[in-house]
């Protein structure tokens, strides 16, 4: 299985990007992983929230293969503790899917088309985080999940 993380817009903060790079490298020891950045939409000032979500949704859906399993990072999604998330990953690996795709949406969330395509939604917290920080948190939790599955000492139970 491959895991892909799709995100809208580049990471501007160099320190944050350095941490993302560290955890991405660690994660790639366990599984094939790809972080793909979808460029920000130009001229968003001229678009309504709905129009921006629709345009971002089209860009997201164009990055998917027909067999991909799409999971949205969404404030209304299911929350897991780290062990529960590792079990969630294991369940997907056991299902025989080729690629599990996590998506961090734009500032207004996802279009209806993206919600309809998704097979699940997860939430990292009830708190709000910057979308750039969420990238780091997701990659770190993926790494943590695999260390839990391998009974490695990174996670303290």
Task: Annotate each PLM feature.
Residues 2, 97-102:
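Loop/turn-to-beta-strand initiation segments
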Residues 1-27:
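N-terminal beta1-alpha1 ligand-phosphate binding loop
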Residues 112-156:
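Structured adenosyl-cofactor binding patch, chiefly the S-adenosyl-L-methionine
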Residues 105-106, 117:
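Proline/glycine-rich low-complexity loops and linkers
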Residues 6, 34-36:
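General small-molecule cofactor/ligand-binding pocket signal
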Residues 11, 75-78, 106-108:
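Short glycine-rich anion-binding loops that position phosphate/pyrophosphate groups of nucleotides
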Residues 5, 71, 105, 138:
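Conserved RecA-like P-loop NTPase ATPase core
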Residues 32, 39-98:
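S-adenosyl-L-methionine/SAH cofactor-binding core of RNA-modifying enzymes
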């Amino acid at each position: 299985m491959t895991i892909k993380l799709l995100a809208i817009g580049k990471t501007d903060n160099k320190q944050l990007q350095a941490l993302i790079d560290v955890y991405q490298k660690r994660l790639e020891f366990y599984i094939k992983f790809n972080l793909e950045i979808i460029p920000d939409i130009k001229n968003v000032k001229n678009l309504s929230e709905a129009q921006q979500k629709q345009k971002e949704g089209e860009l997201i859906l164009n990055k998917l293969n027909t067999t991909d399993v799409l999971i949205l990072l969404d404030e209304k999604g299911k929350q897991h503790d780290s062990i529960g998330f590792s079990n969630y990953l294991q369940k997907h690996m056991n299902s025989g899917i080729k690629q599990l795709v996590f998506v961090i949406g734009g500032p207004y969330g996802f279009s209806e088309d993206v919600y309809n395509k998704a097979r699940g939604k997860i939430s990292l917290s009830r708190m709000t985080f910057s979308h750039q920080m969420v990238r780091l948190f997701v990659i770190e939790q993926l790494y943590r999940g695999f260390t839990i599955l391998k009974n490695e000492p990174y996670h303290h139970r």
